[in-house]
């Protein structure tokens, strides 16, 4: 079975200028990603600062990306919230706008149990009838989708993948035992673990760093699929990832997207920009990475 995508899906940032969504910068960024081998684009997720976007802004961003991409790669809309009915309505609207799939985070704050998660995800999948990527990110939600729950959900015809941001390979192996990896894709949600994640059968990554190095990050996946040892190829990327870890995503990555010309270096509160010294160090790390490519 063909998966939704294989390789690098980009968790797209939202460019702002004077606190307004900058559509021209958004288009330029998406064109850059398409020209540099991104395999999917994920819109209105964590990296997009989605909690600070209005419903109208989310729909405008999604429509803009869908129209520009024009079916060249899948556009996946982040529509999950901790309110099932709101998630259903957002998912229905995403489908109406032309999204190829939706991504659903676990519930948060008003946390449920595993049975509640099953009901929540199945209700949305039943209502919208688009491919669904589950999103497990315990560090942000303080709950997980247990392997047994993934097994149940993987039986739903519309639930086709998991974005696994647990950074826990024991979890990955438990999930793998319980699913059909031919029909259900496992994507890493952690850029720094992709070498081992790919070795363990992951079909790709939903990536933050690919906002600025999509071609290089996709080349890593392609090399692994060709049977090459990618440890050395990953090392310079790993150094840049270490520089990106200076603060919470998406604060650092937007210091780089803005450096490439995709909007100002702006975030919406409660997120704030890096200190100037940290911004300078991060951008220099990016310059060193790019210079190393040309040696």
UniProtKB/Swiss-Prot annotation:
| Active site (catalytic residues) | 135 (proton donor/acceptor), 163 (schiff-base intermediate with substrate)
Q: Where is this site: Part of a proton relay during catalysis?
A: 46, 109
Which InterPro entries does this UniProt record tie to the protein?
Aldolase_TIM (IPR013785), DapA (IPR005263), DapA-like (IPR002220), Schiff_base-form_aldolases_AS (IPR020625)
* One annotated GO biological process: lysine biosynthetic process via diaminopimelate
Keyword Lyase in annotation: yes
For this UniProt record, the keywords arranged alphabetically read as follows: Amino-acid biosynthesis, Cytoplasm, Diaminopimelate biosynthesis, Lyase, Lysine biosynthesis, Schiff base
- HAMAP family in the record: DapA
Q: Provide the E.C. number(s) assigned to this enzyme.
A: 4.3.3.7
Q: What is this protein called?
A: 4-hydroxy-tetrahydrodipicolinate synthase
- Transmembrane is among the record's keywords: no
Give the UniProt family note.
Belongs to the DapA family.
Listed transmembrane segments: none
What's its top-level EC category?
lyase
Q: Which residues form a coiled coil?
A: none
Give the protein's function: Catalyzes the condensation of (S)-aspartate-beta-semialdehyde [(S)-ASA] and pyruvate to 4-hydroxy-tetrahydrodipicolinate (HTPA).
- Among the Pfam families in the record, one is DHDPS
Question: Gene3D superfamilies this protein is in?
Answer: Aldolase class I
- Where does the protein principally reside? cytoplasm
The places in or outside the cell where this protein is found are: Cytoplasm
Q: Which residues bind pyruvate?
A: 47, 206
Q: Which reaction does it catalyse?
A: L-aspartate 4-semialdehyde + pyruvate = (2S,4S)-4-hydroxy-2,3,4,5-tetrahydrodipicolinate + H2O + H(+)
């Amino acid at each position: 079975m063909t998966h939704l995508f294989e390789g690098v899906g980009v968790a797209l940032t939202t460019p702002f200028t004077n606190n307004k969504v900058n559509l021209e910068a958004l288009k330029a960024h998406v064109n850059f990603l398409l020209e540099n081998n991104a395999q999917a684009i994920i819109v209105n997720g964590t990296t997009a600062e989605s909690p600070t976007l209005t419903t109208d802004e989310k729909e405008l961003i999604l429509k803009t990306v869908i129209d520009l991409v024009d079916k060249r790669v899948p556009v996946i809309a982040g529509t999950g919230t901790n309110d099932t009915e709101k998630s259903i309505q957002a998912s229905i609207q995403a489908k109406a706008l032309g999204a190829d799939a939706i991504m659903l985070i676990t519930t948060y704050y008003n946390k449920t149990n595993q049975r509640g998660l099953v009901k929540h995800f199945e209700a949305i999948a039943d209502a919208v009838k688009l491919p669904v990527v589950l999103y497990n990110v315990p560090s942000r939600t303080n709950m997980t989708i247990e392997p047994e729950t993934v097994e149940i959900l993987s039986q739903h015809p519309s639930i086709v993948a998991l974005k696994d941001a647990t950074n826990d390979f024991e979890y990955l192996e438990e999930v793998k035992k319980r699913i059909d990896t031919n029909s259900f894709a496992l994507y890493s949600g952690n850029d720094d673990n992709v070498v081992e994640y790919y070795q363990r059968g992951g079909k790709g990554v939903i990536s933050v760093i690919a906002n600025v190095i999509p071609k290089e990050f996709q080349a890593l996946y392609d090399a692994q699929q060709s049977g090459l040892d990618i440890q050395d190829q990953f090392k310079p990327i790993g150094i840049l990832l270490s520089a990106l870890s200076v603060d919470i995503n998406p604060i650092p990555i937007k210091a780089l997207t803005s450096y490439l010309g995709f909007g100002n270096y702006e975030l919406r509160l409660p997120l704030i920009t890096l200190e100037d010294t940290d911004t300078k160090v991060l951008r220099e790390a990016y310059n060193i990475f790019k210079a190393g490519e040309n040696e």
